[in-house]
């Protein structure tokens, strides 16, 4: 990639905005009547969308018409990618750099364009929080405001519940390799089935759940498509930890106790609920004001 000194002001703007995003998000950058992708994103996007890869000077690029963006975004999400939409915030003026901002970050479990969603079922983002043989599960549909959490015992019961609700995207503690194996269609080892939920907090913010995307604690740590139909994303372990998750959920609902939600001593369920809220607000920068109950 070219250095900042070699870039035009617009391309330097692109690089700055790109650097502030989750590392696995493709950036669609509004440029007139098109959304453009540049550098590595252009190479990836051109391959996934089967569009022409061209160059702007020495910079690889590909573009899609702004009026067809929903269809193209749907294809990227179906391929398991996150997509950041960067729009022009003012009219273009000769000789001046247009102000641009990321207006939304979409993922397979949070896309709500009605034309892309199947009306017969929810479009859930789910979180899995393991604590020995207990699994905390949380499900969010931003389209409807549905927010549910539960606990189940054993690998089979966890998979059964996940397959029943069929989330489009699923996050789990990234260091829990056995859980990843299970969610990919394998099984966990006996040692991991006995492992309790780690009582850790964020090293950077004291467990307050406010880390920005790209900083420690707000990072995506690997994704994969699965035979179950969901996109699997590893996420930082501390986000699922009891103290952090409890703080995150209480802060969201503006309460001092979760007893009224039926979550007393439901540590794994709270871990999943806190993780899914953190992923939405910190990693994807989404507005979750419509999640008013659980």
Functional labels for PLM-detected ranges:
Residues 1-195, 218-294:
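Charged catalytic and DNA/RNA-contacting regions of genome-maintenance
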Residues 197-199, 203-210, 215-219, 224:
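A cross-taxon signal for low-complexity, glycine/charged-rich
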């Amino acid at each position: 990639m070219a250095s900042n000194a070699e870039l035009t002001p617009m391309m330097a703007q692109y690089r700055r905005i790109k650097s502030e995003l989750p590392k696995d998000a493709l950036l669609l950058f509004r440029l007139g009547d098109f959304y453009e992708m540049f550098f590595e994103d252009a190479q990836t996007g051109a391959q996934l969308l089967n569009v022409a890869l061209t160059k702007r000077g020495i910079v690889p690029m590909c573009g899609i018409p702004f009026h067809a963006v929903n269809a193209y975004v749907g294809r990227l999400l179906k391929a398991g990618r996150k997509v950041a939409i960067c729009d022009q915030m003012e009219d273009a003026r000769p000789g001046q750099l247009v102000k641009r901002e990321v207006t939304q970050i979409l993922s397979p479990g949070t896309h709500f364009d009605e034309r892309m969603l199947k009306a017969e079922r929810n479009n859930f983002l789910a979180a899995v929080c393991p604590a020995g043989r207990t699994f905390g599960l949380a499900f969010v549909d931003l389209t409807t405001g549905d927010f549910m959490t539960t606990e189940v015992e054993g690998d089979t019961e966890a998979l059964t519940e996940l397959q029943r609700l069929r989330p489009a995207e699923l996050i789990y503690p990234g260091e829990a390799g056995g859980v990843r194996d299970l969610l990919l269609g394998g099984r966990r080892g006996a040692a991991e089935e006995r492992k309790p939920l780690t009582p850790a907090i964020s090293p950077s913010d004291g467990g307050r759940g406010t880390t920005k995307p790209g900083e420690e604690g707000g990072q995506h740590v690997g994704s994969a498509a699965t035979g179950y139909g969901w996109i699997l994303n590893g996420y930082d372990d501390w986000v699922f930890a009891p103290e952090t998750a409890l703080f995150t959920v209480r802060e969201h609902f503006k309460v001092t106790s979760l007893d009224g939600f039926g979550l007393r001593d439901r540590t794994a369920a709270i871990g999943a609920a806190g993780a899914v809220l953190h992923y939405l607000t910190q990693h994807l920068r989404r507005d979750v004001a419509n999640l008013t109950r659980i």
